[in-house]
């Protein structure tokens, strides 16, 4: 953003609309590819953000600080919420059957296994398993990002119930 010029946004700087700047920042960040991000922000180079991570988080970026926040969430460095123990147990008991399921089939399978589960229960607990957080990319995108091996690895981190 070295070429950024406020005078091109408003002729009257005291009347500068912060919302317009934030909108511009959001759209600019989301339009960048991984190489642009690494070149523009040296701190992100130090964090070794991957193209796969960038593609996962970029549509959730509002401001620059969100990049680091979302990266911490996706990398499970900001665990705040634990999933329901019964949900973990359900996944562990059916892990071999979940292995090859696409996201929508995963949801249907879990509802079939436990008809007390709502889609919301599945989405929130899956998010809590994968990120330990309420925020972040969509649960479907997280499921695709981590894949079965990531889900299984994280499940194995939870104590045996």
PLM-predicted stretches and their roles:
Residues 1-161:
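Conserved nucleotide- and phosphate/pyrophosphate-binding catalytic cores
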């Amino acid at each position: 953003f070295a070429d950024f010029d406020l005078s091109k946004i408003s002729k009257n700087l005291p009347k500068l609309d912060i919302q317009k700047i934030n909108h511009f920042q959001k759209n600019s960040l989301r339009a960048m590819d991984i190489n642009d991000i690494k070149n523009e922000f040296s701190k992100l180079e130090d964090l070794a953000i991957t193209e796969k991570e960038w593609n996962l988080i970029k549509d959730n970026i509002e401001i620059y600080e969100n990049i680091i926040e979302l990266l911490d969430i996706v990398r499970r460095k900001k665990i705040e919420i634990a999933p329901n123990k019964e949900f973990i147990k359900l996944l562990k008991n059916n892990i071999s059957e979940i292995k090859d399921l696409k996201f929508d089939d995963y949801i249907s399978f879990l509802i079939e296994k436990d008809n007390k589960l709502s889609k919301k229960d599945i989405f929130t607990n899956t998010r809590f398993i994968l990120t330990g957080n309420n925020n972040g990319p969509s649960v479907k995108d997280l499921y695709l990002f981590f894949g079965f091996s990531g889900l299984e690895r994280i499940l194995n981190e939870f104590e045996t119930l």
